[in-house]
C-alpha cells in the first residue's frame, strides 16, 4: 500500500498544475518533483536522517533515478547543452497543486489522477514492469517520425474536436501544425453506459478527451469523482509511465477521443523542443540576456509566446497597465510619447515594456509597429522569476531611474 506521503504529494502536484497551467508540462513536472526532493533531503539532513525516504520504501522502482534527480532531461543534449538543472522550478507557484482539464467540463477534481486524499488502489503495483519503461524519446529525431494513427478528419469532426480540445491546457499552447497533428491522430471511440474505459493498476495506453457524456472515477471500488464534456483524463500515466491510479467507467453513453501514448508524448515533447530551437538564436543574440545560463534560456524559451503585428498596429499604449515584456524577433517599431512625439525607433533584437514591470507603473510610452513585426512576449508573473540576473541589467538601463 502506498504511503500517505505519496498520496498527498500527488494531490499537491495535481493542484499545482491546475493553478499554473504550465506551457511545458513535462519540464514543470520534473522541476516540481526535483525541488520537492531537494527540500525533503534538506529536512532529512537537519533531522540527521540520511537520504530521502521513498514513499515506496525499499520497493521504490525509481530509486536509481531518484539519486540523480527524479526526472532526467527529456531533451537530451538539445540546443542548450547538458541536462536541465533539477534545482530550478519553471513555474513559481508550487505550493502544492495538480492537474486541471480546462474547458466546459470539470475542475481539477475531475481528472482521474486528481484524486485528492482518495486511497491509492490496492493493486497499484510499484514494481510492475511496464512495456513503456524503455521508451526513449529524442525530440531532435522527430522529423522522421510518422504517427501510427494519423487520419484526416472531416469538416464535421474538426469542428467537434476544436470545441472539445480547444481550451484543454495540454493543447492550447501548441502551434497550429502541432495542434492539427494532434487532431488528426485522435481516434473516436463511442462507449456504452457501464463500459470500463481504464482499470486501476493497468498500464497506461491512451489519453482521453470527453466530447459527450459523463464518466465516473473509482478507487478500490469507491466512487471518487465524475467528469463531463470538455474534460480529459489519463495523462499522468502516459507522462510518467505509471500504472493507472483509478478505474474510469462510462456513467452514460459517451463519445471519447483517444490519443495513443507514443503520439501523446512525441507531439508534446516535440512541440516544446521546437519552441526552444526557435527562440535559441534570439535569446543568445540579445545583449541584455547574455548573463542567463543555457538552462535559464531554456526555461525562458518555454514561457515565451509569439505575436505578430502589422504596420500601424499599436502594441502597447502610453498610460495602460503593463502586463507583458516584449522581445522583437524581427520588424521595426516607433516609440512615441504624447508630449514629446517620436522618442526612438526599435529594430530586431530590441526589447520594450520592461519599465512598467520593473517599477509597477503604467506604460511610459506608446509602441507602434511600422512594418510587419514579430515579438516574443513574457507575462508579468514570469518576468522576475525567469529573467533572473538579466533583471539587474534591465534596471541599469531603465530610462526612468537616475544613475550616479
Swiss-Prot record:
Region listing for Disordered, in residue ranges: 43-125
One GO biological process term: negative regulation of Ras protein signal transduction
Dimerization and phosphorylation, as annotated region: 27-169
Keyword annotations from UniProtKB, A to Z: cAMP, cAMP-binding, Nucleotide-binding, Phosphoprotein, Repeat
Positions of modified residues (Phosphoserine): 131
Top-level taxon in the UniProt lineage: Eukaryota
GO molecular function, one term: protein kinase A catalytic subunit binding
Polar residues biased stretches: 99-109
Record: residues binding 3',5'-cyclic AMP 2: 288-404
Binding site for 3',5'-cyclic AMP 1: 170-285
Keyword Phosphoprotein (UniProt): yes
Assigned protein family: Belongs to the cAMP-dependent kinase regulatory chain family.
Subunit composition and interactions: Tetramer, composed of 2 regulatory (R) and 2 catalytic (C) subunits. In the presence of cAMP it dissociates into 2 active monomeric C subunits and an R dimer.
Protein name: cAMP-dependent protein kinase regulatory subunit
Record gene name: PKAR
Amino acid at each position: 500500500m502506498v504511503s500517505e506521503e505519496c498520496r498527498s504529494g500527488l494531490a499537491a502536484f495535481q493542484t499545482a498544475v491546475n493553478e499554473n497551467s504550465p506551457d511545458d508540462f513535462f519540464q514543470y513536472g520534473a522541476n516540481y518533483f526535483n525541488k520537492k526532493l531537494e527540500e525533503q533531503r534538506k529536512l532529512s539532513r537537519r533531522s540527521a536522517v540520511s537520504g530521502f525516504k521513498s514513499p515506496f520504501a525499499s520497493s521504490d522502482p525509481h530509486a536509481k533515478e531518484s539519486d540523480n534527480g527524479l526526472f532526467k532531461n527529456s531533451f537530451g543534449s538539445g540546443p542548450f547543452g547538458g541536462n536541465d538543472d533539477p534545482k530550478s522550478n519553471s513555474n513559481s507557484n508550487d505550493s502544492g497543486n495538480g492537474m486541471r482539464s480546462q474547458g466546459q467540463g470539470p475542475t481539477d477534481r475531475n481528472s482521474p489522477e486528481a484524486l485528492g486524499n482518495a486511497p491509492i488502489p490496492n493493486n497499484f503495483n510499484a514494481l510492475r514492469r511496464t512495456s513503456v519503461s524503455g521508451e526513449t524519446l529524442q525530440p531532435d529525431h522527430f522529423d522522421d517520425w510518422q504517427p501510427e494513427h494519423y487520419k484526416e478528419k472531416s469538416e464535421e469532426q474538426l469542428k467537434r474536436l476544436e470545441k472539445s480540445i480547444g481550451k484543454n491546457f495540454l493543447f492550447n499552447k501548441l502551434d497550429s501544425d502541432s495542434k492539427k497533428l494532434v487532431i488528426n491522430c485522435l481516434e473516436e471511440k463511442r462507449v456504452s453506459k457501464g463500459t470500463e474505459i481504464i482499470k486501476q493498476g493497468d498500464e497506461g495506453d491512451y489519453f482521453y478527451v470527453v466530447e459527450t457524456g459523463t464518466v465516473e472515477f473509482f478507487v478500490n471500488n469507491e466512487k471518487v469523482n465524475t467528469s463531463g464534456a470538455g474534460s480529459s483524463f489519463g495523462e499522468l500515466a502516459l507522462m510518467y509511465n505509471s500504472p493507472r491510479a483509478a478505474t474510469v467507467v462510462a456513467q452514460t453513453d459517451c463519445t471519447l477521443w483517444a490519443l495513443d501514448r507514443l503520439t501523446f508524448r512525441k507531439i508534446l515533447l516535440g512541440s516544446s523542443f521546437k519552441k526552444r530551437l526557435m527562440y535559441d538564436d534570439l535569446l543568445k543574440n540579445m545583449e541584455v540576456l547574455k548573463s542567463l545560463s543555457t538552462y535559464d534560456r531554456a526555461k525562458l524559451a518555454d514561457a515565451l509566446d509569439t505575436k505578430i503585428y502589422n504596420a500601424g498596429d499599436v502594441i502597447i499604449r502610453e498610460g495602460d497597465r503593463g502586463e507583458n515584456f516584449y522581445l522583437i524577433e524581427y520588424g521595426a517599431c516607433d516609440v512615441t510619447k504624447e508630449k514629446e512625439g517620436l522618442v526612438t525607433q526599435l529594430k530586431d533584437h530590441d526589447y520594450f515594456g520592461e519599465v512598467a514591470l520593473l517599477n509597477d507603473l503604467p506604460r511610459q510610452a506608446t509602441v507602434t509597429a511600422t512594418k510587419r513585426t514579430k515579438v516574443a512576449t513574457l507575462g508579468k508573473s514570469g518576468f522576475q522569476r525567469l529573467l533572473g540576473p538579466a533583471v539587474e541589467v534591465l534596471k541599469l538601463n531603465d530610462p526612468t531611474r537616475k544613475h550616479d
